Design a protein with these regions (language model features):
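His/Asp/Glu-enriched short active-site or ligand-binding loop at hydrolase and phosphoryl-transfer sites
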Residues: 281-285
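Active-site mouth of glycoside hydrolases
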Residues: 46-275, 286-289, 308-309, 321, ...
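C-terminal region of N-terminal signal peptides and the immediate post-cleavage residues
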Residues: 29-45
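Short acidic, glycine/proline-enriched helix-loop-strand junctions
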Residues: 360-376, 380-383
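N-terminal export and membrane-targeting signals
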Residues: 2-24
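Short acidic/histidine-rich active-site segments
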Residues: 314-316
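A beta-strand-loop signature enriched in Asp, Gly, Thr, and Trp
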Residues: 290-298
Length: 384
């Protein structure tokens, strides 16, 4: 690339970012004023969903939510780069039992029009509108740990220190820092009656990459990663709560002993006053309600969540099926798993993952419309 082209690209990106920043200027000023004083860490009254150590409530009634991860809901190929196939939003939300919970990607990259380079909230607004119209609840994830459907870059330790506040002018699929995106997103959708909680990062892990592929078996885990991760939740959480004092914040912890949350560190991070709900993600133990060992297993995480005074949502449960296992057997295994987890004290269960184009002739975790797991979701949900 010639120096002139590089210079032009930098200039174009600068003005794009300047235009994007105008969207959040009022919000940023308000946040600056609010965070100059101490922000109350506890959610204020008024949200539809509330949390205690005993679980979740929706509209004041006990709520043990079930539902799906449907990461691609904001995909619209006529606007953004997408993340999976496009979904008929009314058809999807209309197919669920009322007051189900859906976790989906609300990444900055999906708010950028790939043709104009400008912010375009249309596809995301459509998700909230469809959820509201169909009496459903949603859990938006603001950014992924691994960069999938975003910049494809693994978030290392430095990102959690201060990288989340910095804008990378070379990034094709970003017009602002994560900090700015969080402020824009929260200000825009905080009053939606479909909003259950905010999730800052899916499966956070502030480790260090030692090779270009950042393979998990070669990553390094500095001794201060738990402190770094908790500090991130307290800094970002305070800014989020300054904009939205009512709605819950959930930490999207994988829970299996990852860097920063292994062993006792899981409880330390969970005890942040800006974390209201903790998570566990369950894979590879088909039909086993409480997988894992005495240090990082789900039983240990439930105990730690209780000690921290937080409910624990099993936000991902995945099992392979299709060519390798019947859909009916998978549904039976997951039903048994959820029953056992509910008895052990979890606060809800979300399955991985709904797709509009399932591949029944392959071995996948796809869940399409009409899958027997829809019956499990309906049977296991509790409200009232």
């Amino acid at each position: 690339m010639s120096p002139n082209v590089k210079k032009l690209r930098r200039s174009t990106l600068f003005w794009r970012r300047a235009a994007a920043v105008l969207i959040s200027a009022t919000t940023a000023l308000a946040v600056s004023c609010m965070t100059s004083r101490t922000v109350d860490a506890s959610p204020q009254p008024g949200a539809r969903v509330t949390a205690t150590v005993d679980g979740l409530k929706l509209d004041g009634q006990d709520w043990w939510p079930t539902g799906f991860n449907a990461y691609q809901l904001a995909t619209n190929w006529s606007v953004n780069w997408g993340c999976g196939a496009m979904v008929d939003l009314d058809d999807y939300f209309g197919s669920l039992p009322p007051k189900s919970l859906t976790r989906f990607n609300l990444f900055q990259a999906l708010a950028i029009n790939r043709f104009t380079g400008e912010m375009d909230f249309g596809p995301m607004d459509a998700v909230f509108a469809a959820a509201e119209a169909n009496n459903q609840m949603i859990l938006p994830v603001l950014s992924p740990q691994d960069g999938a459907c975003e910049d494809e870059t693994f978030k290392e330790r430095s990102w959690y220190v201060d990288g989340w506040t910095e804008y990378d002018v070379t990034a094709e699929r970003a017009l602002m820092s994560f900090q700015d995106w969080m402020e824009v997103a929260v200000a825009r959708w905080k009053d939606s009656p479909a909003l259950a909680a905010w999730e800052l990062v899916g499966e956070p892990e502030p480790s260090l990459c030692t090779d270009a592929a950042c393979n998990w078996w070669t990553r390094e885990c500095p001794t201060d990663t738990a402190q770094i991760l908790r500090s991130f939740y307290e800094a970002a959480g305070a800014e989020l709560r300054a904009i939205d004092p009512k709605n819950l914040i959930t930490a999207g912890l994988l829970g299996g002993g990852q860097c920063g949350t292994g062993g006792d560190d899981y409880q330390y991070v969970s005890e942040s006053p800006y974390v209201d709900v903790v998570q566990y993600h369950d894979y590879g133990a088909d039909g086993v309600p409480l997988p894992g060992d005495q240090w990082n297993g789900l039983a240990r995480r439930i105990d730690q969540a209780e000690a921290a005074g937080k409910p624990l949502l099993v936000a991902e449960i995945g099992e392979w099926a299709g060519s390798c296992e019947s859909l009916e057997d998978r549904a039976s295994h997951i039903s048994d798993k959820i029953e056992g987890q509910k008895l052990a004290g979890t606060a809800g269960a979300l399955l991985w993952a709904f797709v509009p184009d399932p591949r029944p002739q392959e071995c996948t975790m796809d869940i399409g419309k009409g899958d027997p797991l829809y019956g499990v979701v309906a049977a296991e949900a509790v409200w009232g």
